[in-house]
């Protein structure tokens, strides 16, 4: 069910139903659970007419056996109400939603997550039935809980603003807060694992982190105990004990709030990573320069939203694309950016589609163009599939042809890059944290690099790759999803080692960049030396540039499985120090003072499926460690192109520090694009693979 294999699940549920009915009788609670699931599968398969009977039978069994106020009754009520809502039987749905909410409030207390879910369900129902004024107070209640669902609150807040039920300022700030809290979840895995590592220490931060973990564990245990208690028959319940547990949960919430304030004062870096306070419009505007515009995106089920902010103005508009439609368009947009496939394609079908690039510009930036188009720099905070979209390759004017007759024709497209430098932020709060610490002195050494790691000893090349011939190879590899290599509680490293292609040309890339920036051979780590052991033992804070030319691994589309990671040499005997995977939580423990962290060699930004949010967790961890900006590849990069773009960017910034990182990258890409010595130079896959993540301005 969780993987949406609904058709496969149906016969299994039917079999389970037959077994339970035979073994336990037709009115056993387990039978009701299976019936409820069967009805849900029917709904998911768009068979509404078939769904009603099993859900109603489930409800009847639960009411009879468990009692009318049992939490499981609320579950059946909620599913039946959702079915009626989908059928637009609003008069039938509303009392069921309200009864489900009342049951959960009585049984679980007003602050329980299930109560927030029921409140969200009722709020969204009222909104879709045209009653925004009734939906708004319920949506605001979920916002206060900190557990608001973006798909619910954003449409309601947007509609309330349009209907003047909320002031512009209040609606925008509440929407911004909801978006920022939603963004935190995408990096939660790395943050949680970092907290575990920090808690193992003996200093003041470790003490506070351990206390937070203990309180969270106690609250979770009490919550489970309450659910178990209220699931019993009325005669078996200890109501006084339940009330004491609820009181203790409330006290824990207060203690944790105080602890967060202490962390914010004593360890602001950690607090900004683990539990950042949302920024409002008035907090953001002073952080922007006069030449900057910030666009913040949130994409939910059926629509998306963009909030544009400059020093002097703000706008909030709807995007006419929902999550699925946008994911499909971003995937189609990226197809022409695989160099190997573009060259091998017969005809023009494999080449980059300028018309689609313009269509996405109109949808994503067109609604706020009046506020943003005259700014020199655009700061983008993407979400969902937009994390996989290279915004600088959007086209601002309708092209003469979707695919030019010749590659040179791409040079004349109205690329957004010609108008603005683009930088990406993994979260809204990162603007504040990066600019607060952007004035540190840079490292004293130019660069250290890690590349051509050994994944499979059987495929290992020459021991000394520093003397490589300099031959350039086009890389055509995909970011690997953890979910392809998951075994039990960990990654199957043997299988991963066999699957990861070796990257011999990255040795040439690293050596070329090192020569250009003046780094010594001793600072370039190749082959087996490109390992976690070498990295963790190095004095990384002395380097201005830290360069990784290797594969990125993303958590994939199954949440909770691992962290985004960088693949280094896989050791013969994995250890806690070195297992070959540099995870986001390990990155956060590094001590950096780098102007740049470069992630080259693969499409580190996104996985095989647009929306696999590797960006947020990995980038936030590098920023926490002390990096000011990341230069990250969107797709498999030609080694020569990677070298040319990175060295040009570094040289431009060195010669003109006042232009800032984003403008330096922009000029490097435009110089490549406008180089008429080869038709290939005009093709966006060659000049446009890198995105700047983090601080792009002069600080």
Go through the PLM ranges and name each one.
Residues 254, 267-699:
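Catalytic cores of enzymes
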Residues 1-4:
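Alpha-helical segment of the N-proximal tetratricopeptide repeat
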Residues 37, 44, 48-49, 56-60, ...:
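Alpha-helical solenoid repeat scaffolds used for protein-protein interaction
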Residues 28, 70, 112, 547, ...:
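Histidine-centered active-site/metal-ligand motif
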Residues 11-12:
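Leucine-rich, hydrophobic repeat-scaffold detector
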């Amino acid at each position: 069910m969780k993987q949406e294999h609904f058709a496969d699940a149906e016969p299994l549920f039917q079999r389970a139903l037959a077994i339970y009915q035979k073994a336990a009788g037709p009115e056993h609670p387990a039978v009701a659970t299976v019936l409820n699931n069967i009805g849900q599968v029917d709904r998911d398969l768009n068979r509404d007419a078939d769904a009603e009977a099993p859900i109603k039978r489930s409800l009847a069994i639960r009411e009879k056996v468990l009692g009318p106020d049992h939490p499981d009754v609320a579950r059946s009520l909620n599913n039946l109400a959702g079915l009626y809502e989908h059928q637009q039987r609003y008069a039938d749905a509303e009392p069921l939603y309200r009864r489900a909410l009342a049951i959960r409030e009585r049984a679980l207390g007003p602050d329980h997550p299930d109560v927030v879910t029921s409140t969200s369900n009722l709020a969204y129902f009222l909104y879709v039935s045209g009653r925004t004024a009734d939906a708004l107070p319920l949506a605001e209640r979920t916002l206060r809980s900190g557990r608001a669902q973006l798909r619910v609150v954003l449409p309601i807040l947007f509609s309330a603003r349009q209907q003047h039920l909320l002031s512009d300022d209040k609606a925008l700030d509440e929407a911004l807060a909801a978006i920022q809290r939603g963004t935190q979840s995408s990096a939660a895995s790395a943050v949680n694992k970092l907290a575990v590592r920090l808690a193992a220490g003996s200093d003041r931060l470790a003490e506070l982190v351990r206390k937070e973990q203990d309180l969270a564990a106690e609250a979770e245990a009490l919550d489970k105990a309450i659910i178990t208690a209220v699931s019993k028959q009325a005669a078996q319940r200890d109501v006084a004990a339940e009330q004491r547990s609820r009181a203790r949960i409330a006290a824990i919430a207060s203690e944790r709030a105080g602890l967060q304030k202490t962390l914010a004062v004593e360890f602001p870096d950690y607090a900004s990573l683990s539990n950042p306070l949302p920024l409002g419009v008035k907090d953001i505007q002073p952080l922007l320069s006069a030449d900057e515009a910030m666009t913040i995106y949130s994409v939910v089920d059926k629509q998306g939203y963009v909030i544009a902010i400059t020093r002097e103005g703000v706008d909030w508009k709807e995007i006419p694309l929902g999550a699925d439609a946008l994911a499909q368009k971003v995937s189609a947009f990226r197809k022409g950016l695989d160099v190997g496939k573009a060259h091998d394609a017969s005809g023009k079908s494999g080449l980059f589609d300028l018309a689609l690039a313009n269509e996405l510009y109109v949808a994503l930036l067109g609604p706020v163009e009046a506020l943003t188009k005259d700014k020199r720099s655009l700061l983008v905070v993407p979400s969902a599939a937009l994390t996989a979209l290279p915004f600088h390759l959007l086209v601002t004017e309708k092209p003469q042809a979707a695919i030019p007759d010749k590659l040179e024709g791409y040079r004349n497209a109205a690329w957004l890059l010609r108008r603005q430098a683009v930088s990406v932020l993994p979260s809204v709060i990162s603007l504040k944290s990066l600019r607060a610490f952007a004035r540190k002195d840079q490292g004293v050494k130019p660069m250290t690099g890690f590349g051509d790691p050994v994944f499979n000893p059987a495929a290992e090349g020459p021991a000394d790759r520093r003397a490589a011939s300099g031959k350039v190879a086009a890389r055509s590899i995909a970011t690997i999803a953890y979910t392809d290599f998951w075994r039990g509680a960990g990654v199957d490293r043997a299988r991963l080692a066999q699957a990861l292609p070796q990257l011999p040309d990255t040795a040439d890339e690293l050596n070329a960049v090192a020569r250009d920036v003046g780094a010594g051979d001793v600072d370039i780590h190749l082959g087996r030396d490109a390992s976690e052991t070498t990295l963790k033992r190095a004095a990384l804070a002395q380097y201005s540039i830290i360069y990784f030319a290797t594969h990125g691994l993303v958590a994939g589309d199954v949440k909770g499985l691992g962290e985004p990671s960088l693949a280094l040499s896989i050791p013969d005997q994995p250890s806690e120090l070195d297992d070959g995977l540099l995870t986001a939580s390990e990155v956060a423990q590094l001590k950096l003072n780098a102007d740049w962290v470069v992630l080259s060699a693969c499409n580190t930004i996104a996985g095989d499926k647009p929306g696999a949010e590797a960006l947020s967790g990995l980038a936030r961890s590098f920023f926490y460690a002390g990096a000011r900006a990341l230069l990250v590849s969107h797709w498999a990069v030609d080694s020569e192109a990677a070298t040319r773009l990175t060295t040009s960017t570094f040289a431009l910034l060195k010669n003109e520090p006042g232009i800032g990182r984003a403008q330096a990258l922009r000029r490097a890409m435009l110089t490549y694009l406008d180089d008429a010595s080869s038709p290939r130079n005009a093709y966006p896959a060659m000049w446009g693979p890198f995105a700047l993540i983090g601080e792009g301005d002069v600080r």
